[in-house]
Amino acid sequence: MTHWHITSWVVALILVFVSYGLYGSGKAKGAKITHMILRLFYIIIILTGAELFVRFANWNGEYAGKMLLGIITIGLMEMLVIRKKKGKSTGGLWIGFIIVLVLTVLLGLHLPIGFHVF
């Protein structure tokens, strides 16, 4: 299940950049399609993450923190794409997104079921 989770968030990250770029270039139809596919991947990420949490968490704070950071990351991804679609500024959101994404990945790598890089 870990591989499904990692694959889904990698694909979601790619889709965020594609949707963002398509909205920026004015290709609304293609952007809408990729945005809907991105939303499907949000659901997959949340479901696989919840399954990993229930299976391996032992109900400690690190796993709960990782889950919370993951949900915040998904929220920021969606906010980036929506604000670009509406033509609003996204500078601050990009900074917040990158910080939260890095924290989420680092915490995920630190946890026992992650890849043991650290």
From Swiss-Prot:
The chain crosses the membrane at residues 4-24, 33-53, 62-82, 93-113. InterPro entries: UPF0344 (IPR010899). GO terms for cellular component: plasma membrane. It is found in: Cell membrane. Its main location: membrane. Keywords: Cell membrane, Membrane, Transmembrane, Transmembrane helix. The keyword Cell inner membrane does not apply. It is a multi-pass membrane protein. Belongs to the UPF0344 family. This is UPF0344 protein RBAM_010920.
